[in-house]
Amino acid sequence: MFNRSEKVAEAIHELVSGLIVKGMKDPRIGFITITGVKVTDDIRQATIYYTVMGDDEARVSTARGLASATGFLRREIGKQLRLKFAPELHFKYDQSIEYGNRIDQLLKEIETEKGSDD
């Protein structure tokens, strides 16, 4: 069963994803994917996890763009979700994709080494 904070997190995920694609014109924000949102039980804070295609420069640039868009996004969340208090937004780069890719790469290397030993 979903509690209120999980429902709000899901709504924020959909809304922020849409706003970034359609509503933001900041050139610093590159090809970004929102991977998850966690909201505190009191709905006062939301952590938005994201990934960015590109190098470290693209990641830094996107982080700056998101930081400057926080007020706009928070205002839109409050308006569109009709919350008494719009949560304070925190953006955090999601390293799980990179971590998974690294594990996959290591497993392939092990498999290649086993194949050459036979």
Curated annotation (Swiss-Prot):
Belongs to the RbfA family. One of its GO terms (biological process) is ribosome biogenesis. One of several proteins that assist in the late maturation steps of the functional core of the 30S ribosomal subunit. Associates with free 30S ribosomal subunits (but not with 30S subunits that are part of 70S ribosomes or polysomes). Required for efficient processing of 16S rRNA. May interact with the 5'-terminal helix region of 16S rRNA. The lineage of its organism: Bacteria, Pseudomonadati, Thermodesulfobacteriota, Desulfuromonadia, Geobacterales. Its main location: cytoplasm. This is Ribosome-binding factor A. It comes from the Bacteria. InterPro entries: KH_dom-like_a/b, RbfA, RbfA_dom_sf, Ribosome-bd_factorA_CS. HAMAP family: RbfA (MF_00003). Signal peptide: none annotated. Monomer. Binds 30S ribosomal subunits, but not 50S ribosomal subunits or 70S ribosomes. Keywords: Cytoplasm, Ribosome biogenesis. Gene3D superfamilies: 3.30.300.20. It is found in: Cytoplasm. SUPFAM superfamilies: Ribosome-binding factor A, RbfA (SSF89919). GO terms for cellular component: cytosol. GO terms for molecular function: ribosomal small subunit binding. The keyword Iron-sulfur does not apply.
